[in-house]
């Protein structure tokens, strides 16, 4: 495990509690992962980390809040997908790989499900009904322009249907909206649906993994790849969960936070939580995380432009390449990776 000893220059940091601002409401995947990380970071270091939620505008509200705080390491950011929707959706200008230092802990799969009494028992039923009544079937999302909105829009586009997207403050609330009959289809992540599918309260229509998922009770969450193979070339990468810190924070403090993050992500309690929620462990830090952040934003900018998402900025406006040219574009002019921690 990485050493968590402080440098002499910053031995007194932190002198007070740290605040972790989560961009979605309590109960969803982002909140669950970041709260567990905060608990395990505290256990590894003795730091006191308070978690607060500031949902809204697909992360833009939380982003502005943290950006308006001093860059002293006392206010951290908890996001999904490197907070890519804030900039792509027009809610902010900060870039994830130049203005922030993000660390990735895990990834998650998308999911659609319905109540047992729904007239739609399969993904094919939804396609047929949506084609018969374009734009009438409703699906819940974790927020306008967010991860599960993007995934649902790409699936609908690939299937040749139109849906009505109903935003909620988190993936968990989107799942509950489907459970309570507020929408025709519950959107969200596998981790937010699997417990309800397992107990028979929801029926799985599809999930974005490459293979079927079988719950503890034997219920099957079918892979979208088997029903709509062409969508795999268009789907955005699966959702990720990230801890961020302002990049203009003193370097020694950033590396202390990174060391605590890595210790937390490798803890038994964090790994057990991920297994229970069907998350996938995938830790990235440094230039690998920066590259991933830029790649995800590039894919989403192209997707939002193609789907004509209202208010979204184009790749040209954001200074991003076509996804097919990303490898040639990265690293962009002016990019500077943070130095790695000395051995």
Predicted regions and their residues:
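Bacterial N-terminal signal peptides
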Residues: 1-5
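N-terminal (or domain-start) structured segment
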Residues: 11-98, 136, 160-196, 268, ...
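Structural signature of the Rossmann-like NAD(P)-dependent dehydrogenase/reductase core
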Residues: 19, 53, 141, 203-208
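Hydrophobic alpha-helical segments typical of transmembrane helices
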Residues: 33, 37, 62, 122-125, ...
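Hinge/capping helix and adjacent helix->loop/strand transition within the periplasmic-binding protein
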Residues: 41-44, 65-75, 87-173, 240-273
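Secondary-structure end/capping motifs
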Residues: 244-309
